[in-house]
Swiss-Prot record:
Transmembrane segments: none annotated. Keywords: Calvin cycle, Carbon dioxide fixation, Chloroplast, Disulfide bond, Lyase, Magnesium, Metal-binding, Monooxygenase, Oxidoreductase, Photorespiration, Photosynthesis, Plastid. RuBisCO catalyzes two reactions: the carboxylation of D-ribulose 1,5-bisphosphate, the primary event in carbon dioxide fixation, as well as the oxidative fragmentation of the pentose substrate in the photorespiration process. Both reactions occur simultaneously and in competition at the same active site. Belongs to the RuBisCO large chain family. Type I subfamily. It comes from Blechnopsis orientalis (Fish fern). The lineage of its organism: Eukaryota, Viridiplantae, Streptophyta, Embryophyta, Tracheophyta. The record marks 311 as: Transition state stabilizer. GO terms for cellular component: chloroplast. The basic functional RuBisCO is composed of a large chain homodimer in a 'head-to-tail' conformation. In form I RuBisCO this homodimer is arranged in a barrel-like tetramer with the small subunits forming a tetrameric 'cap' on each end of the 'barrel'. Pfam families: RuBisCO_large, RuBisCO_large_N. Its cofactor is Mg(2+). Gene3D superfamilies: Ribulose bisphosphate carboxylase, large subunit, C-terminal domain (3.20.20.110), RuBisCO large subunit, N-terminal domain (3.30.70.150). This is Ribulose bisphosphate carboxylase large chain. One of its GO terms (molecular function) is monooxygenase activity. It is found in: Plastid, Chloroplast.
């Protein structure tokens, strides 16, 4: 399984693993073990190996390089033949590549840093239900980032008071408000009541401002059937967008919801709840850029992507690297930004990155510079924490955004 002379094919799925072998285990042996366990291998030779062509189907560790400044840590590059994976299934992709190998005895730690998804495979996925340009056309909003707000307190409000907070924020000038990721259907606020009061707030704020407004109605539920029932009700109410927690809900549920949203004209906002369990450790788990690529294939029009300047962790260059992987068609390899492979998405629509977490109006100049126009800037406490209330907080955000955009556009002539 360690084949340094292997020439990768355009159709191979390529993976970059950061691996820390156990003391005494050679890097080549560890790399071969990763390639074997994540493809056709097992712990011993079996007689049924002779009934198939392992050369055709096995993963190959084709390169290993030491990590600068780290003792006994290596980047192992593995190539997988396309036929190992079911078309259009992120679930199967991850089950194969990361499903079992992370508990391997020969390794102290293992982290999947990046994947190269070839067009031959990415074209089998639904991708974002609509994409950036279609969303702008639906909302009739151009030339600036979109503004959002997560309603706080995240838990405990009644449906009517929740709807009131939504109305005040949208009336003040925001484009979107949002259910928190853990707002589903709890005893203090059942989902149907919340949807009804939020719909009333949407229509009232639209009538008063003349702008199209949205609220991310969280359709995440305990079963796929219940999730789709909530999405259907949101569409019947005339809501433009629903939301899903894609890691806790699962990729199968997420792709099912993405198909429904595309077929029924709903935008799909994605929250990454639970991501830090997977991506926080620097030497074990999976980098968020891999989860971001998986989401773009599984389906979503927005996804939370860190802020660089807020309360949550995020390095500027690395964050901008996976923001480009979400938005752009073609992204060149750039190790300084953590991009291990050139990625060609061909015609797959882009995903709007959402900056959210501990940001407020004083961050607006930095946010508009870092994320550009094709983004959603989402302020929770940065809106609702305004000393004069929710609506003035929304006004402050909108004024700050428009001032920054005007300063950028007109520069010294302002």
């Amino acid at each position: 399984y360690y084949t340094p002379d292997y020439k990768t094919k355009d159709t191979d799925i390529l993976a970059a693993f950061r691996m820390t072998p156990q003391p005494g285990v050679p890097a080549e042996e560890a790399g071969a073990a990763v390639a074997a366990e994540s493809s056709t291998g097992t712990w011993t030779t079996v007689w049924t190996d002779g009934l198939t062509s392992l050369d055709r189907y096995k993963g190959r560790c084709y390169d290993i390089e030491p990590v600068a400044g780290e003792e006994n840590q290596y980047i192992a590059y593995v190539a997988y033949p396309l036929d190992l994976f079911e078309e259009g299934s992120v679930t199967n992709l991850f089950t194969s590549i990361v499903g079992n190998v992370f508990g391997f005895k020969a390794l102290r730690a293992l982290r999947l840093e990046d994947l190269r998804i070839p067009p031959a495979y990415s074209k089998t996925f639904i991708g974002p239900p609509h994409g950036i340009q279609v969303e702008r056309d639906k909302l009739n909003k151009y030339g600036r980032p979109l503004l959002g707000c997560t309603i706080k307190p995240k838990l405990g409000l009644s449906a009517k008071n929740y709807g009131r907070a939504v109305y005040e924020c949208l009336r003040g000038g925001l484009d979107f408000t949002k259910d928190d990721e853990n707002v589903n259907s709890q005893p203090f606020m059942r989902w149907r009541d919340r949807f009804l009061f939020v719909a009333e707030a949407l229509f009232k704020s639209q009538a008063e401002t003349g702008e199209i407004k949205g609220h991310y109605l969280n359709a995440t539920a305990g079963t796929c059937e219940e999730m789709l029932k909530r999405a259907v009700f949101a569409r019947e109410l005339g809501a433009p967008i629903v939301m899903h927690d894609y890691l806790t809900g699962g990729f199968t549920a997420n792709t099912s919801l993405a198909f429904y949203c595309r077929d029924n004209g709903l935008l799909l906002h994605i929250h990454r709840a639970m991501h830090a369990v997977i991506d926080r450790q620097r030497n074990h788990g999976m980098h968020f850029r891999v989860l971001a690529k998986a989401l773009r294939m599984s389906g979503g029009d927005h996804i939370h992507a860190g802020t660089v300047v807020g309360k949550l962790e995020g390095e500027r260059e690395v964050t901008l690297g996976f923001v480009d992987l979400l938005r752009d068609d073609y992204i060149e390899k750039d190790r300084c930004r953590g991009i291990y492979f050139t990625q060609d998405w061909v015609s797959m629509p882009g995903v709007l990155p959402v900056a959210s977490g501990g940001i407020h109006v004083w961050h607006m100049p930095a946010l508009t510079e870092i994320f550009g126009d094709d983004s959603v800037l989402q302020f929770g406490g940065g809106t609702l924490g305004h000393p004069w209330g929710n609506a003035p907080g929304a006004v402050a955000n909108r004024v700050a955004l428009e001032a920054c955009v005007q300063a950028r556009n007109e520069g010294p002539n302002l």
